[in-house]
């Protein structure tokens, strides 16, 4: 599901809100989440999961085109850990 599909679905389910209002709310929520992660804080949404930063240590990688070694710096990357309720709901899905 894309962001625009999510906005459309929420606007349909919440008929008292316009698509523009839903879009604004989604954008603001995502902006607040990004800002929180930028400061190094953790985000926890009970029943859904938590977002945090994980550190990736410096390492030696390879350029896939040339095969030469490339030194990669350490960096922080966003990490999502699903909550128990979300894990259980997804586990119940039979493809």
Swiss-Prot record:
- Keyword Isomerase listed? The answer is no
Q: Region Disordered: which residues?
A: 56-76
Q: Name one Pfam family in it.
A: Bac_DNA_binding
**GO function terms (MF aspect):** DNA binding; structural constituent of chromatin
Question: GO CC annotations?
Answer: chromosome; cytosol
Q: Which InterPro entries match?
A: Hist_DNA-bd, Histone-like_DNA-bd_CS, IHF-like_DNA-bd_dom_sf, IHF_beta
Q: Which GO terms describe its biological process?
A: DNA recombination; regulation of DNA-templated transcription; regulation of translation
**PROSITE patterns attached here?**
HISTONE_LIKE
Residues of the signal peptide: none
Name the UniProt key words of this record, in alphabetical order. DNA recombination, DNA-binding, Transcription, Transcription regulation, Translation regulation
Question: PANTHER family from the entry?
Answer: DNA-BINDING PROTEIN HU (PTHR33175), INTEGRATION HOST FACTOR SUBUNIT BETA (PTHR33175:SF5)
- Describe its assembly: Heterodimer of an alpha and a beta chain.
* Biological role: This protein is one of the two subunits of integration host factor, a specific DNA-binding protein that functions in genetic recombination as well as in transcriptional and translational control.
Question: What family is this?
Answer: Belongs to the bacterial histone-like protein family.
This chain's protein is named: Integration host factor subunit beta
Q: Which organism is it from?
A: Shewanella frigidimarina (strain NCIMB 400)
